[in-house]
Each structure stands twice: as structure tokens, then as C-alpha cells.
Amino acid sequence: MNYEDVITGQGIEKKFKNFELNIPELHIPKGFSTALIGENGAGKTTLLNILAGIRRDSKGDIRYFEQKQNIEDALVKERIGFTGTKNFFMGYWNGDQVKEMMSMLFDSFDADKFDGICRSLNIDSTIFGKRGKSVSKLSDGNRMKLMLATVFARNTDILILDEPASPLDPLMRDMLGDMIRAYLAEGDGLRSVVFSTHNVSDMENVTDYIIIIDDGRILEEGFVTDLKEKYILVKGEREDLAAAEQHLITCQSNSFGFEGVALTDNMNKFAGMDVEFDTPNLFNISVAVMKQNSKLTMPVL
């Protein structure tokens, strides 16, 4: 697939005491929704914070909009919206103060649009008005909805969203998917979204491109359609498990049969076995790739 990059990175590094993010090359495709997937502590938040300019103590060269531009440049900041896992509102602010601060910080912030989004998302109305309660009183889900309202109320070209679905209920996760699709559609190929998620199944319908990270490094990346051709889901009977398992990246089995993920190029190795092939979903692919490098082991229960 031919595409342009909206963000590119070279030699991105950030060292901590017991962890190192090391991304030799990074490509975020323009006009698409990119999901960053990985275990807890894999480096997703660190990478997104670097891209959003929250962390400025990393090494490497990052280019936005096909040019080398400083994330501190006001024109670049104006074109990027960011939500993080930590509440970036002052705890004592109420809804009106949030709106006032966003209006001061970003020229494209539309206060009326913000009000409309807050109503549509059913955000607790008691935070608004002269005696509105502080945003610290909101539930985790409502705080995330409020953060989303601030970025969707701006005219941006990139949204960087760190775990936006995590605190949301199933209905709001579905709504978030609709909002991302609408945002991309309104940009007519010029807008892009980058988000991290553990809710792979819930967010699959809005994911075009994935980057799977483990221990600070990229394990796999590509358009979802391409990866669904690269990998194949294999299902078979119990009697073929021993022969099939050696060709599977991951495998789950019970007394009736097995299911696992393999490389499509290895389909011929299942010849003579009573197996069925199917298209894997994004969850199947992500877990298969992550399990190859994971330190997790099944405990004795």
C-alpha cells in the first residue's frame, strides 16, 4: 500500500534505570488510525509522550508533517491533540475553568463545540457553572470523556491518545470508535490518529495500522489487512495437536481440539492434517506476536 507518513522517527531512545526505549525507525501513516499495542511496561506511554512533546529528554530525530519541526513550535502544537493516562487538568478546576484554559492555550478550540460534545457524551453537568464541582470529583470514565471533549473540540491534524478506551464503559468505547472514524473522515485523508490500547478487540474496528511493542522495541507493524494475510488461524482435532504445534506461533488446546496462529507461508506444513484455516482477528495476531517475547508464564493454580 502506498502512503505518506505524518510522523517519522529515527533513533528514538529513552533510558530509565531498568528499561530502555529503542526505536531505530518509526512510521505513522498519514490519514489512518494507528494502534500501539503491547504489555504493561512495554514502552507505549513513553513513546506517545515523546511524540506529544510531554517528554523532552529523549534522543532521536522526529519529523511531523513530512518536515523536521520542533514539537515546541506553536504551529505544530496547534495541529496536535493529546490525551494521557494521567489527568492533565488541575484538580480544583471545574468544567468552566477547563473550557477557559483550553481557549487560552489553543486558537482552534471551539467552546461551543466543546459544550455540545460534553452534552452528547453525558458528562456530569454538575462540574459546569459558577459553583461547578471540581473535575477531581469525576469518575475515571467521565474524566477521560472530558479530556476527549477538549481534543475533539479543536481543529487538529493528529490525535495522540494514550489508553483512551481503558476507563470507558463498553457503550462509550463504541462511541469513541465512531468519533475517531468521524474525525478521520472529516479530514479527507489529511488527519491521523495514534492511540495505545489493551482493549484490542473493542478497538479493532477503528484500527488501520498496528505497531506491537515489547520491552521498548517494535516487534511487528503493518496495516491490519496485510497482517491478516501474513498470519493464519489454524483449528484442528486433538489427534493432530502434536504434529501441528511445532508449526504454530501460539496454541491453545483442550480435550476437543486446538486453535493457534501460524505464518501463512507455513500453511503447506499442515498438509495431511485435519485442520481448518481462518482469518485471524487483531487480538489473535497481537497475542501471538507478544507471546513469543513475553516473560509471562502460566502459574500453578
Please give the residue ranges for each predicted region:
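A short, flexible loop at the N-terminus of ABC-type nucleotide-binding domains that lies
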Residues: 1-25, 30-32, 73
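The feature captures the beta-strand-to-loop junction immediately N-terminal to the Walker
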Residues: 37-39
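Helix-to-loop junction immediately C-terminal to a conserved catalytic motif
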Residues: 52
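Conserved ABC transporter NBD signature motif
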Residues: 60-71, 75-76
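ABC-family P-loop ATPase nucleotide-binding domains
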Residues: 84-146
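Catalytic Walker B motif of ABC-type/P-loop ATPase nucleotide-binding domains
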Residues: 159-163
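C-terminal coupling/interaction segments
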Residues: 249-301
